[in-house]
Each structure stands twice: as structure tokens, then as C-alpha cells.
Amino acid sequence: ELRLGDGLSVLSAGEVGTIVLAGVSAQTTWEIIEQAPWVMQPGGPRLVLVPATRHSELRRWLWAHGFALAADRPVQAAGRWYAVMAAEYTGERKEASFTECLFGRTDEWPEGAGYAAWQKAKLPRFRLGVPDGTALAEEIDALLESSPSQAASRPALSKGEPLA
């Protein structure tokens, strides 16, 4: 069945088990989700998300709105890195650090080191817009001084285990 509509407006709760949103910005992705409140319910559909831009901002939004990342895999295509995220609504909100949002769970995959290096290479330019003496500036400076593998490292998790 083919339906024409805006975002998820043509669907209702219980009609689908998985929703794929790919190739749009992080902001467009979360706006589509926000317009379908039935997605943000326990037992709701699994989301497979591939934001074209601002992966870290989408991770922050997901965690802040009660989603857990069941998977977060980096994929390189045409010289550009993408993050393929599988998210499920749990209702447990998480305030994540800049580092967690920047790298997500990508260190669980062989491609994680390349993704971390790509993310880290963008930090000097981003740092220019962050005021000195702030916690964010200190976190970015520490990342810039670390190796890519150290930057993305965190306590090991089993695949599919949400960040606590």
C-alpha cells in the first residue's frame, strides 16, 4: 500500500513496527517524530534513522526525549560518514555529554575508528565558536588532545544495550 502524506501523518499507532527516516537533517528527523506522538510511547515502533547532517544533535535529542539507541553504526559512502541509528522509546531520559553525543555507540563497530577520526577532524573549527572557560570548551580541548580511539572510548557495552 502506498500513501502520500507529510511525515508520519498518514500512519496511526500500531500500523507499523519499524519506521525508516533517512537522508534528511537531524532537525527534520526529530520534527517528524514530534508530529507523531504515538511513536513516543512504550512499545512503539523501532526507528531506523540515518540523518544527513548533525548526527550528534540527533543523538542528544533522542536521549533527552526517552529513546535508547539499540544500535549506532557508522557507514562511509562516497567519502562521507553517516550514522545508522536504531532507536526505541523507553521513556528513560538521558542527559548525555558532548562526547557521548559526538561519537554515540559507533566504537562498537570496526568502522568506529574512522568515524571518530572524521568527527574529531571537525572539532577545531567547531571549537572556535565555543567560549573559553566553559565546560564544553574543556571537553572539546580534551578531545583534541586525545587520539581518535581514546576520544571515542567509553565503558564497553554489549551490542543493543542502551547507554545508562
Each language-model region and where it sits:
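Class I S-adenosyl-L-methionine
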Residues: 8-10, 15-21, 27-164
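Conserved SAM-binding strand-loop segment of SAM-dependent methyltransferases
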Residues: 1-7
